[in-house]
UniProtKB/Swiss-Prot annotation:
<dbReference type="InterPro" id="IPR009000">
    <property type="entry name" value="Transl_B-barrel_sf"/>
</dbReference>
<feature type="region of interest" description="G2">
    <location>
        <begin position="70"/>
        <end position="74"/>
    </location>
</feature>
<feature type="binding site">
    <location>
        <begin position="146"/>
        <end position="149"/>
    </location>
    <ligand>
        <name>GTP</name>
    </ligand>
</feature>
<feature type="region of interest" description="G3">
    <location>
        <begin position="91"/>
        <end position="94"/>
    </location>
</feature>
<keyword id="KW-0251">Elongation factor</keyword>
<keyword id="KW-0378">Hydrolase</keyword>
<dbReference type="GO" id="GO:0003924">
    <property type="term" value="F:GTPase activity"/>
</dbReference>
<dbReference type="InterPro" id="IPR004161">
    <property type="entry name" value="EFTu-like_2"/>
</dbReference>
<feature type="binding site">
    <location>
        <begin position="14"/>
        <end position="21"/>
    </location>
    <ligand>
        <name>GTP</name>
    </ligand>
</feature>
<keyword id="KW-0648">Protein biosynthesis</keyword>
<keyword id="KW-0479">Metal-binding</keyword>
<protein>
    <recommendedName>
        <fullName>Elongation factor 1-alpha</fullName>
        <ecNumber>3.6.5.3</ecNumber>
    </recommendedName>
</protein>
<comment type="function">
    <text>GTP hydrolase that promotes the GTP-dependent binding of aminoacyl-tRNA to the A-site of ribosomes during protein biosynthesis.</text>
</comment>
<dbReference type="InterPro" id="IPR050100">
    <property type="entry name" value="TRAFAC_GTPase_members"/>
</dbReference>
<dbReference type="Pfam" id="PF22594">
    <property type="entry name" value="GTP-eEF1A_C"/>
</dbReference>
<comment type="similarity">
    <text>Belongs to the TRAFAC class translation factor GTPase superfamily. Classic translation factor GTPase family. EF-Tu/EF-1A subfamily.</text>
</comment>
<feature type="binding site">
    <location>
        <position position="21"/>
    </location>
    <ligand>
        <name>Mg(2+)</name>
    </ligand>
</feature>
Length: 425
């Protein structure tokens, strides 16, 4: 197994045309993860379609439909190595209706690179991306100000974008001084692996240098096992193979596991990562595994796998702390939007507005408010309309954070602070 280096999941986030996929393609290419002849082939193909600059982006957008439309749709997992780490890139789509993909992508990330184009600067979506990165608990951020070639490598422009993004970070309670900013051109390759002579005014490290400064998150191996399922495949000769990322605990061959809320159990026969069989999987590993006694219809996206003697909680109702990002009118009791939590998407009804909080300090402003509007923070109670695995965010951050979506937009984001468990036995 070639995993001696520590592993980091990296989300690359950005507005639709800000060069996110090109940045990822360039990283992969410079790290030697993409053979030069493939890039050449993509280049020719891209030029013949009049999209010459998309060559690196095509490394990521390897889905036919995406190529035609020039947008990243599903989350692509790619691997590349730096001197110090090996990275799995979660390329998060930037289109508006893909924010929910981004939520499930970003919630798997240990660190994020937010790509902002120098000529355009901060866009509406950039705000949402910064906010979601915060809500989804991504502590380490690098802001790559891309397309510097299109801004004449101008230092003043870089500083302007830096201060605009800095203002956004402050809004969500992140100190901009803890975030690394770097001017790049993914297309030209400036400041990716070597410092660009076109921007002598930038004295910092290259993008690869900054990636090597990231810290590997502590692996919560001592916690109970939790694996949110992204998909379940039927593979001939093997059977059903659920796929997901281990969030906490250790998954071992021979273990008895239970999938919730499906309430189906079986024994782990084999575990695979990056197409190689492994004896056990630890937090951060994106894996496929085969379970004896589990059929194709027993497991679906949104289920969570745990040890049979300590299965994931299924929420009868839950209390959450949320921040309302946007809503055309007011949110009242009875509102039933879709909650995107780990890989699940489930409609939940607001059953009680417990209190309104000051978003900056967390102090209570009002008990039992009659409604909530954009900008409010609150404690609420909710009831899932169908079984949903949800855990207290203090114990299992990855299974307790969520985004709330309705009408094609992210309405709110938050975390679960208490779960009333459903009896499943």
């Amino acid at each position: 197994m070639a995993t001696e280096k520590p592993h980091i999941n990296l989300a690359v986030i950005g507005h639709i045309d800000h060069g996110k996929s090109t940045t990822v393609g360039r990283l992969m290419y410079e790290a030697g993860a993409v053979p030069a002849h493939i890039i050449e082939q993509y280049k020719k193909e891209a030029e013949s379609k009049g999209k010459g600059s998309f060559a690196f982006a095509w490394v990521m957008d390897n889905l036919k439909e995406e190529r035609e439309r020039g947008i990243t749709i599903d989350i692509a997992h790619k691997r590349f190595d730096t001197d110090k780490y090996y990275f799995t890139v979660v390329d998060c789509p930037g289109h508006r209706d893909f924010v929910k993909n981004m939520i499930t992508g970003a919630s798997q990330a240990d660190a994020a690179v937010i790509v902002v184009a120098a000529p355009d600067g901060v866009m509406e979506q950039t705000k949402e991306h910064v906010f979601l990165s915060k809500t989804l608990g991504i502590k380490q951020l690098i802001v790559a100000v891309n397309k510097m070639d299109a801004a004449n490598y101008d230092e003043a422009r870089f500083n302007q974008v830096k201060s605009d993004v800095g203002a956004l970070l402050k809004m969500v309670g992140t100190n901009p001084d803890t975030v690394k900013f770097i001017p790049i051109s993914a297309f030209e390759g400036d400041n990716i692996t070597k410092n660009s002579d076109k921007m002598p005014w930038y004295k910092g490290k290259t993008l690869f240098g900054l990636l090597d400064e990231l810290e590997v998150p502590d692996k919560p191996t001592e916690k109970p096992l939790r694996v949110p399922i992204q998909d379940a495949y039927s593979i001939s000769g093997i059977g059903t193979v659920p796929v997901g990322r281990v969030e906490t605990g250790i998954l071992k061959k021979g273990m008895n596991v239970t999938f919730m809320p499906a309430n189906k159990s079986g024994e782990v026969k084999s575990i695979e990562m990056h197409h190689e069989e492994i004896p056990q999987a630890v937090p951060g590993d994106n894996i496929g595994f085969n379970v004896r006694g589990i059929g194709k219809d027993d497991v679906r996206r949104g289920d969570v796998c745990g040890a049979s003697d300590n299965p994931p909680a299924v929420a009868e109702e839950f209390t959450a702390q949320i921040v309302v990002l946007q809503h055309p009118s007011a949110i009242t009791v009875g509102y039933t939007p879709v909650f995107h939590c780990h890989t699940a998407q489930t409609a939940c009804t607001f059953t009680e507005l417990v209190k309104k909080l000051d978003p900056r300090t967390g102090q209570t402003l009002e008990e039992n408010p009659t409604f909530l509007k954009a900008g409010d923070a609150a404690i609420i109670k909710c009831h899932p309309t169908k079984p949903l695995c949800l855990e207290n965010a203090k114990e299992f951050p990855q299974l307790g954070r969520f985004a709330i979506r309705d009408m094609g937009q992210t309405i709110a984001a938050g975390m679960c602070i208490n779960v009333v468990k459903k009896q499943m036995r």
